[in-house]
């Protein structure tokens, strides 16, 4: 009694309630080769360990705008990096507490060919380099899973624990979509 069911759309690719980080102030990209974070992947544009729930905050005003155009659920992630980490699936119900709004706190893994705004690493400097980095990451992941690594890599371990999640690739255009599909086939990933 007093409850209603409304049909609605699901936006599977949004940054609802998650702020895009600001570009680092100061110098431009450098020939930095080591990760700026100890214990993580050597390239700072691989952020597979990031979980969208870490920075998520419900935005009533934005939720109202989305509901007005027919959306009731969003899959939200941080648009930052080549491997962007995981997203959060959120119901857009204002009177609900977050515990009821959060449908899944690890809904999917997100990817793009764009570098992280928070890193000054210069590599990769092209789409081809981004493609090579994704390939290298998944080759390294296979090598790591086989027990060949002496040190822990938290970014690779996060990707291993999230390997069964759906994969969403922000390709930006049709040629990059074809490139993402090609990488997916090569690395046995379903984008």
Show the residue positions of the predicted features:
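Residue-level marker of alpha-helix boundaries and capping positions
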Residues: 53-54, 171
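Phosphate/adenylate-binding glycine loop and adjacent helical scaffold
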Residues: 58
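Polyanionic/metal-chelating signatures
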Residues: 62-191
